[in-house]
A protein has these predicted regions:
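Cytosolic catalytic domains that perform sulfur/thiol-centered chemistry
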Residues: 1-183
Length: 183
């Protein structure tokens, strides 16, 4: 990697922040000091964001986030860029970090089983598995897994309604869902 390469990193982590507003200013200050740009969303349910900056600065930001309550095990994905992909740094307060419009859903209370890529290939090959692509219409248009069901949503916020209207179709199936952030 050349010296001028930037680290681009994305994360989301569900946890419980009693006062996300108190986390905002210190995080923004750290990012600005380290030359990091992008967007971080903070909510009572956790943190979500994509940022870019010098590798050492990103490492300092991740250390800061890992020190927050409930975040010691957060995961992130990294890539590189030769040009800064973002114009400014924003740390925003939101009601949800992944917009679903479902205030009574607590993602920490129950999630699906995450599988690694080798398990995924075996899983979606099974005849009793329905594969659902939860990404938006633009992302699905770029490509999807063969046989995946496209809910034809413009945003993830539309997915809960689609599921409520269609879950009866899957009563005898295992469900494998995927999105841009992971499988």
């Amino acid at each position: 990697m050349t010296q001028n390469m930037l680290t681009v990193s994305a994360l989301y982590h569900f946890t419980r922040f009693d006062d996300p507003d108190a986390l905002r200013a210190p995080m923004l200050s750290l990012c600005e000091h380290e030359g990091i740009k992008g967007t971080i969303l903070l909510a009572k349910e956790g943190i979500n964001g994509t940022v870019a900056g010098p590798k050492q600065g990103i490492a300092r930001l991740w250390a800061h986030i890992a020190a927050l309550p409930g975040c010691s095990d957060f995961e992130h994905k990294e890539s590189t860029a030769s040009v800064m992909p973002f114009k400014r740094m924003k740390v925003r307060l939101k009601k949800e970090i992944v917009t679903m419009g479902q205030p009574n859903v607590d993602p920490r209370a129950g999630t699906g089983h995450y599988v690694d890529p080798l398990e995924w290939n075996a899983l979606i090959s099974a005849p009793d598995v329905a594969v659902i692509d939860t990404r938006n219409d633009y992302e699905v248009g770029i490509g999807t897994f063969e046989g995946a069901i496209d809910p034809k949503t413009k945003t993830f916020r539309e997915f809960p309604q689609w599921w409520a209207e269609n879950k009866h179709r899957f009563h005898n199936k295992k469900i494998a869902m995927f999105c841009t952030g992971g499988i």
